[in-house]
Swiss-Prot record:
Organism, as annotated: Saccharolobus solfataricus (strain ATCC 35092 / DSM 1617 / JCM 11322 / P2) (Sulfolobus solfataricus)
Molecular-function GO terms, alphabetical: RNA binding; structural constituent of ribosome
An annotated GO BP: cytoplasmic translation
Protein name per its UniProtKB record: Large ribosomal subunit protein eL15
Family according to the record: Belongs to the eukaryotic ribosomal protein eL15 family.
Domain of life: Archaea
Pfam families the record matches: Ribosomal_L15e
Keywords: Ribonucleoprotein, Ribosomal protein
Amino acid sequence: MALSMYHYIENTWNSEEWKKSVLRQRLIKWRKEPSIVRLAKPTRLNRARSLGYKAKQGFVIVRVRVRRGGLNKPRPNKGRRPKRMGVYGYSPAKGYRWIAEERAARKYPNLEVLGSYYVGEDGLYKYYEIVMVDPSHPVIKSDPKHKWLQDPSNRNRVFRGLTSAGKKVRGLRKSRGLKGTVRYKWNRKQKEREEKKRHEASKYYKLQEYDKIPGK
């Protein structure tokens, strides 16, 4: 069976030699450009097509740049130790990809976010490409695969966590549900602490033959 074009695109993208040569030059160019840029065509065609992208009217590709780290945390103007300022060491509750989708949706309020994918990162930023659709375009209205975006229940879907990035952060992936998320594990461990049970991170957690755990 012959391999498809998308197979070779994926192999090229995962090649370390290609990342050091081509992608590095692209990142240098992207850093000089604005944070939100509309593109003529997707950088990763295989990922865009997997999200439902079609090369026809009504589809728009946008590249969004998001700063890495804890983003902008307001620094308190009242007196306290710098250690207690609460500025450093905190990560945003949302994923970077979800943040990028929301920024693209605010930039183009007449479009709806269909999906997004990662395209690169450097020491300061992460870059994502957002697949957006114009639900009012006649081509989209007549497309049976994408006319569902006209429904009022799908309006501003990115701000309600209905995209893939939003569902991932909310722990709503169909493959696992809420039971495998970080929030679920934290709540479970917190309940064990309150009930004074053996914590799963304990060194002697699996040593059931001991009546008394050493050091406790």
